[in-house]
Amino acid sequence: MAIDENKQKALAAALGQIEKQFGKGSIMRLGEDRSMDVETISTGSLSLDIALGAGGLPMGRIVEIYGPESSGKTTLTLQVIAAAQREGKTCAFIDAEHALDPIYARKLGVDIDNLLCSQPDTGEQALEICDALARSGAVDVIVVDSVAALTPKAEIEGEIGDSHMGLAARMMSQAMRKLAGNLKQSNTLLIFINQIRMKIGVMFGNPETTTGGNALKFYASVRLDIRRIGAVKEGENVVGSETRVKVVKNKIAAPFKQAEFQILYGEGINFYGELVDLGVKEKLIEKAGAWYSYKGEKIGQGKANATAWLKDNPETAKEIEKKVRELLLSNPNSTPDFSVDDSEGVAETNEDF
């Protein structure tokens, strides 16, 4: 429906005044916004990148990753850092839990010599450091581990047993309001790791909740629920965890998709194992009996050998990855869900998702 000429002139004058006062780009028509194509960073898991719909975690946004203890939260964020560093990006790790293991981080592919690290004394200090890094425009990825460990200054200076009702929630709420705009302007990805708590007296529905109040839930563009659903075994030895991630909230694509992958102890996400599974599912890799082949060439007998072959042939692995991304990311109705091939090396646990 056409706007009459007088209204168009008035609108043009108003837009000109706003741009003069607040700068070019402060207001625009949504279709003209060049930032609509969101830049993303890989999570290190191919199936999770596809479940997110955009090929990874969005830059300039807030992301929350939560789950039970030992579910792979820190491992997943370290894989994001490693992927970002491979693209030449600068990353920072705010270690509020004082538990970051640099040796483990290096094993996952993190360049620890170029990783900025801070172990703040208080929650306010941690969030101010995040804000300063974001405003600098020089840091691309910031990880905060974890929201539960962001202790307000008043609580640290008080006695154990004192009541500090709502302090952490108020601190997080103020920080979110301040950070959201700065992150967008500097195109910085901020990832919060969070823990799960149980609500008391919940008879029906899910009693689980995350720490730090509700502000983070609202401001996060992506929320990921990560759970350990099984054990990866070699013979009698447990060598890793079978992991499921559910995209609980997603502002950049359709939510509620989920991905399953293996986290191997000391190695991180079994990326090449995912590549074999998704390659077979999309008929890029042929499987006949126990043998796997690509373009008529046998690449291994059994999934473990096929995975090892792809690891030794990164050019072919990249070619298959590119084809899988093109097939699944171009189709909005696609899902990366797959059953692990013949349940090979997977033992179920009783943990609820």
UniProtKB/Swiss-Prot annotation:
Residues 330-353 are annotated as: Disordered. Disruption phenotype: Triple mazE-mazF-recA mutant cells no longer undergo an apoptotic-like death upon DNA damage characterized by membrane depolarization. Keywords: ATP-binding, Cytoplasm, DNA damage, DNA recombination, DNA repair, DNA-binding, Nucleotide-binding, SOS response, Stress response. Its main location: cytoplasm. InterPro entries: AAA+_ATPase, DNA_recomb/repair_RecA, DNA_recomb/repair_RecA_CS, P-loop_NTPase, RecA-like_C, RecA-like_N, RecA_ATP-bd, RecA_C_sf. Induction: Induced by DNA damage, repressed by LexA. Induced in response to low temperature. Sensitive to temperature through changes in the linking number of the DNA. Induced by cold shock (42 to 15 degrees Celsius) (at protein level). 5.1-fold induced by hydroxyurea treatment (at protein level). mRNA levels are repressed in a mazE-mazF-mediated manner. SUPFAM superfamilies: P-loop containing nucleoside triphosphate hydrolases, RecA protein, C-terminal domain. The rate of DNA-strand exchange is stimulated by RadA. One of its GO terms (cellular component) is cytoplasm. Residues 339-353 have a biased composition (Acidic residues). It holds the Pfam family RecA. ATP binds at G67, P68, E69, S70, S71, G72, K73, T74. SMART domains: AAA. It is found in: Cytoplasm. GO terms for molecular function: ATP binding; ATP hydrolysis activity; ATP-dependent activity, acting on DNA; ATP-dependent DNA damage sensor activity; damaged DNA binding; DNA-binding transcription factor binding; single-stranded DNA binding. Signal peptide: none annotated. Polymerizes non-specifically on ssDNA to form filaments; filament formation requires ATP or ATP-gamma-S. Interacts with and activates LexA leading to autocatalytic cleavage of LexA, which derepresses the SOS regulon and activates DNA repair. Interacts with the C-terminus of RecB, facilitating loading of RecA onto ssDNA at chi sites. Interaction is decreased by ATP. Belongs to the RecA family. Required for homologous recombination and the bypass of mutagenic DNA lesions by the SOS response. Catalyzes ATP-driven homologous pairing and strand exchange of DNA molecules necessary for DNA recombinational repair. Catalyzes the hydrolysis of ATP in the presence of single-stranded DNA, the ATP-dependent uptake of single-stranded DNA by duplex DNA, and the ATP-dependent hybridization of homologous single-stranded DNAs. Mutations in this gene were selected in directed evolution experiments for resistance to intense ionizing radiation (3000 Gy). This is Protein RecA. It comes from Escherichia coli (strain K12).
